[in-house]
């Protein structure tokens, strides 16, 4: 009986501890929200999208928040697990109709948008392919959450037109300066 009470008390105290961000974030763009989240990665006027193994539909790298995790760290972790990419997480761009938070993310290594990205071992259960797509090549029927396809296009289009999606001659897309 005492052991069960101790375990329950320990768990409650663990979840009550303050959250620390255990992921790289753009200085000045830190966000303390907790939510399911993902990354919008833009380079050379293309977006990085995953083909989900079950259903074959496209979507952003991202997923479900873990206990005590910040939304920006959820986006970072899920992108690392599903796409094998280490990113720096920037500003929150949108909250989708299903509550999913979309963050602007920047790869920490140069990316070649003319090549598919290999699916990492950690992503193989959920992801069948990773690639770069122009927005004009996408359609609602091929989008995982079809009911928010137009919202995604609007968010990605605005990000491409803003200073957060600067196109560069090099293969890297650096986070904005503070």
Predicted regions: what they are:
Residues 1-8:
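Bacterial N-terminal signal peptides that target proteins for export
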Residues 16-18:
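N-terminal signal peptide c-region/cleavage motif recognized by signal peptidases
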Residues 20-38:
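Acidic, metal-coordinating catalytic segment for phosphate/diphosphate chemistry
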Residues 46-47:
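Entry beta-strands of beta-propeller and related beta-repeat scaffolds
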Residues 58-63:
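A short gly/proline-enriched turn/hairpin at secondary-structure junctions
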Residues 65-88, 95-148, 176-178:
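Unchanged
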Residues 147-178:
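Charged phosphate-binding loop/patch that engages nucleotide di/tri-phosphates or the phosphate backbone
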């Amino acid at each position: 009986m005492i052991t069960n009470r101790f375990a329950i008390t320990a768990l409650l105290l663990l979840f009550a501890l303050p959250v620390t961000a255990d992921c790289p974030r753009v200085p000045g763009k830190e966000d303390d929200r907790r939510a399911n989240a993902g990354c919008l990665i833009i380079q050379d006027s293309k977006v990085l999208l995953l083909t989900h193994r079950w259903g074959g539909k496209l979507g952003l790298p991202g997923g479900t928040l873990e206990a005590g995790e910040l939304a920006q760290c959820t986006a970072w972790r899920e992108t690392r697990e599903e796409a094998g990419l280490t990113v720096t997480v920037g500003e929150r761009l949108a909250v989708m109709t299903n509550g999913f938070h979309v963050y602007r993310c920047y790869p920490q290594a140069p990316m070649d948008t003319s090549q598919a990205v290999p699916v990492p071992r950690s992503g193989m259960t959920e992801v069948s392919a990773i690639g770069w797509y122009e927005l004009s090549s996408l359609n609602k029927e091929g989008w995982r959450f079809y009911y928010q396809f137009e919202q995604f296009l609007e968010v990605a289009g605005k990000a491409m037109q803003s200073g957060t999606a600067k196109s560069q001659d090099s293969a890297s897309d650096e986070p904005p300066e503070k």
